[in-house]
Amino acid sequence: MTKDELCEALHREMLFYYFAQRETRLEIRTGESLISAVWRKMKPYADCGFPRPITEADIEMLCNCSFAGLFHYDLEKGAERIAQLEQELKSL
């Protein structure tokens, strides 16, 4: 993979990993859109070392993913994948 592809894979994995965190629940308030609720859930994680800033397209991608799959995301495997991608980036 190229450096750009690795950065994008890392960014995507981090989105899934932090979205799946149980400390912050996805709560949709009355009159609130799903996109706004996902933005609010992800906001605390924005400074967690993402390769690039979280964008509206990222939030839309999370909204279009299977939430059932994201809520059953394996955090341990995700952390391992993130570490692997970070190591690959460092070795470039």
Predicted regions and their residues:
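The feature captures the hydrophobic core positions of alpha-helical coiled-coils
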Residues: 6, 82-85, 89-92
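Acidic, low-complexity, intrinsically disordered interaction modules
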Residues: 19-83
